[in-house]
């Protein structure tokens, strides 16, 4: 109902992004059981599409059961585009099977290019990727901020750490996480290598950042999603970000 409402308010412009999250967040933060993420996502999508059709739903899945459910409001559209967040192979395969688009995050450029080429040859969907982005007139400040953000996700996000370890950055992830366990976030960003930074982030002055964005586009991404990371003054930093990417 929330998605249908936002689609009405936005005059049919909503794209619904869905993700199953990870075991630590679901179980430790929310107190729920994390199980069967691929099957759970498959049923999410089936149920949402049935609900938007305004038909009465009687659904019996392996995860969810619904009896006599009908959406109470009249949706703007009978079909809202659904994009799925995907990291590992099973979720990537499901996404290309049932979704309108995919949302990638912290995926090395070369690996992402190979995955997009392989999957798009089977069926074309929209490809998006959220990219850690730090823009400053001082390139070194931008790079430092990006390294700290990347080190944070590697330290606390086991699913990203494991994926990156299997895809070209085994030593880096091991070292960054090891230092995090010893001293927290004090200095583990210093272990982010130039290769890792260039493969996963946009960081630099405005001209450098625009060039780096093009690398991600060239990998097959249709819609880069800029993850804003402010440097010093947030308002000024956001103004520079807009000037960099939105103004010719």
What is each of the regions a protein language model found here?
Residues 1-248:
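Active-site-adjacent structural elements that line small-molecule/cofactor binding pockets in enzymes
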